[in-house]
């Protein structure tokens, strides 16, 4: 990722948040930059022309991928490095692996990241090796070098974290929070993984405050580490075709572009709070 002598927050737009006809157009990069984003995240590996078009506007670029076997970590890391990406967020495994298989995957991710000099952030995503908070905590204890992408809605909604005390569960996952170097931003409630949060006011949406608590802790942990790169906060509000955005009477619940800007506002507030606590 981009070298820096100071800690900083960089807000990236995940291109999967935009309609297909929009995010395949280089014109979208201008709108993204004008909205205040400093980079973009590609879902699939684009052509080099696309990468260069973003970079020509001063936008950072990162990518994503999936690793199903140890060898896949090295192939993906090399492809990401060759594409000029700053980092990759990765889905690893399917969540059905035993501990020995999980350990082999984790070791390969770490080795591939070091070999190709590109951060590989393992996502806290359903249907992956980090789908469960207990296993995630145990894994980072065994592999403290593992870097993690905080895709918190998968845990918050998928594991119904409010049931049994969300504060206790946030405390429990602290060892994972300390390893998080990337955030995929969407906010869910206990029943739906992606919901309209209005202007971000938590007075009537207490789940917003829960996400902000986690994000602030993630930023605090980042600020305690050596300043080697900026922190990537990637807005990732996905469409109804994959059952993320909700629809009512054939219309999406909210404007995902506008909601992404609310998430950016919350991220900056959380980062400032973390800086004040440092």
Task: Tell where the protein language model's regions lie, with residue ranges.
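Acidic/histidine-rich catalytic cores of soluble enzymes
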Residues: 115-201
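A short, acidic, amphipathic alpha-helical segment used as a generic capping/interface helix at domain edges
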Residues: 168-171, 207-228
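N-terminal pre-domain/capping segments
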Residues: 1-83, 265-278
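Charged helix-capping and loop-helix junction motifs
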Residues: 23, 78, 101-108, 133-134, ...
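Aromatic-rich peripheral "rim/lid" segments of glycoside hydrolase catalytic domains that contact
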Residues: 239-278
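Active-site acidic/histidine proton-transfer and metal-coordination neighborhood
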Residues: 60-148, 157
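Active-site-proximal loop/turn and secondary-structure-junction residues that shape catalytic pockets
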Residues: 13-15, 44-46, 67, 92-96, ...
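Hydrophobic faces of well-ordered beta-strands that scaffold small-molecule active sites
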Residues: 3-15, 40-42, 59-65, 88-90, ...
């Amino acid at each position: 990722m981009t070298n820096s002598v100071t800690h900083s927050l960089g807000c990236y737009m995940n291109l999967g948040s935009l309609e297909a006809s929009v995010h395949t157009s280089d014109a979208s990069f201008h709108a993204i930059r004008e909205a205040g984003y400093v980079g973009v995240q590609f879902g699939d590996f684009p052509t080099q022309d696309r990468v260069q078009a973003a970079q020509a506007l001063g936008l950072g670029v990162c990518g994503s991928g999936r690793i199903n076997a140890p060898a896949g970590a090295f192939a993906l890391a090399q492809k990401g490095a060759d594409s000029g990406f700053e980092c990759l967020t990765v889905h690893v495994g399917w969540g059905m692996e035993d501990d020995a298989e999980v350990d082999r995957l984790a070791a390969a991710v770490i080795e591939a990241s070091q070999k190709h000099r590109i951060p590989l952030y393992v996502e806290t995503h359903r249907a992956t090796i980090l789908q469960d908070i207990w296993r995630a905590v145990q894994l980072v204890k065994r592999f403290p070098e593992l870097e993690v992408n905080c895709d918190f809605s998968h845990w918050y909604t998928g594991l119904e974290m409010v049931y049994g005390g969300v504060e206790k569960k946030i405390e429990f996952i602290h060892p994972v929070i300390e390893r998080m170097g990337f955030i995929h931003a969407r906010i869910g409630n206990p029943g739906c993984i992606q919901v309209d949060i209005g202007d971000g006011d938590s007075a009537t949406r207490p789940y917003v405050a829960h996400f902000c608590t986690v994000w602030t802790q993630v930023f605090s942990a980042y600020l305690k580490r050596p300043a080697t790169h900026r922190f990537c906060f990637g807005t990732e509000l996905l469409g109804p075709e994959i059952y993320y955005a909700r629809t009512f009477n054939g219309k999406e619940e909210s404007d995902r572009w506008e909601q992404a800007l609310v998430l950016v506002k919350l991220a900056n507030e959380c980062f400032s709070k973390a800086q004040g606590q440092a």
